[in-house]
A protein has these predicted regions:
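ATP-binding N-terminal substructure of ATP-dependent carboxylate-amine bond-forming enzymes
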Residues: 1-111, 137
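Short glycine-rich anion-binding loops that position phosphate/pyrophosphate groups of nucleotides
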Residues: 21, 80-82, 155-157, 201, ...
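Short acidic-hydrophobic, aromatic-tinged amphipathic segments that line or gate anion-handling sites
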Residues: 54-59, 131-135, 166-169
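Short catalytic-loop micro-motif centered on adjacent basic/acidic residues
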Residues: 76-77, 102, 128-129, 185-187
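A conserved helix-loop-beta module that forms one wall/lid of the active-site cleft
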Residues: 95-98, 102-164
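Internal nucleotide-binding/catalytic subdomain
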Residues: 163-259, 263-265
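Glycine-rich phosphate/pyrophosphate-binding beta-alpha loops
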Residues: 273-286
Length: 286
């Protein structure tokens, strides 16, 4: 059922998040005849400066989420940090439930890196060796298992190089585990020739479309340049797209999925998943 609340008969999409991605989404929404309603932390946030209907609130507050979602045709996000249990409650509301894209059953795999790794391994997707790090003993054992090639990650909340550490010694790893007040995981550090991104879009009916695979030039963990199409062999590009499509299907992702990849010697490994507009996709606006 489509619930149109806009006075001009336009469908309304509630966007949780007020950053650059939400701002760019607003530009595309105008061309599609969709009205954006924004949940923003401040009225001078990037997206709040260009969206007409702005509701100030906190994305971790269930009542603020309900307020921005009320009467909308769909709810989506420009980041993955909304509490998953709140997203589920929006879907399960006994009165006027709201479609949420992506659904919480998929979103969890973009929110929690350890759950993501476990699920991708179940699917047979190429991922680095990894382990939960819940104690010094876990850290010690993982260091030895990967010959000291350790990337330590916060399982939640990290992005753009934040929440990632590369300890130079076992003692540094043990100190980090003791100091950091966050759930952690370890991954084998992967040498790579380039970073790639395979972006796809999937609708509720399961139809999927893929964009060309992009090479991402990073600086300090932040994408500075996206080269599309990536200068890689056609067979490798096809492998990247097919992997992204399979992950979207298996996780039942709706909306946009970006699969960040490391490539070395023609072999790929999944780095991260993002279920939202992605920095490597800005070029699609042009």
């Amino acid at each position: 059922m489509v619930r149109v609340t806009n006075a001009y008969g336009m469908p309304v999409v509630a966007v949780v998040g007020d950053g650059q991605l939400a701002r760019m989404l607003q530009t595309e929404a105008i061309e599609l005849g969709v009205e954006v309603r924004l949940l923003a932390g401040t009225d001078d946030a990037s997206a709040a400066q260009v969206v007409h209907d702005v509701r100030l609130g906190d994305y971790t507050d269930l009542e603020d989420l309900r307020r921005v979602a009320a009467g909308a045709d769909a709810v989506t996000f420009d980041h993955e940090h909304v509490p998953n249990e709140h997203v589920q409650l929006l879907l399960d509301a006994p009165v006027d439930p709201v479609p949420v894209e992506p659904r919480p059953q998929a979103l969890i795999y973009a929110q929690d890196k350890l759950e993501q790794r476990r699920r991708l391994r179940e699917l047979g997707a190429p991922v680095p060796a990894f382990a939960a790090i819940e104690s010094a003993a876990d850290a010690d054992a993982f260091w030895d298992s990967v010959d000291g090639e350790v990337c330590l990650k916060a399982t939640r909340g990290g992005y753009d190089g934040k929440g990632v550490w590369f300890p130079a010694s076992k003692s540094e790893l043990l100190s980090l585990v003791e100091e950091l007040d966050a759930p952690l995981m370890g991954e084998r550090k992967i040498p790579f020739d380039r970073e790639l991104s395979a972006m796809v879009a999937r609708n509720r009916a399961g139809e999927i479309r893929a964009w060309p695979v992009v090479e991402s030039i990073q600086d300090g963990g932040v994408c500075r340049v996206a080269i599309s199409p990536a200068g890689i062999p056609d067979e490798l590009a096809r492998e990247c797209r097919e992997l992204a499509c399979r992950i979207a299907e298996e996780l039942d992702v709706t909306g946009v999925l970006a699969v960040e990849l490391f490539e070395a010697g023609g072999e790929i490994r999944v780095n991260e998943l993002a279920m939202r507009p992605h920095n490597t996709g800005h070029w699609t606006q042009d």
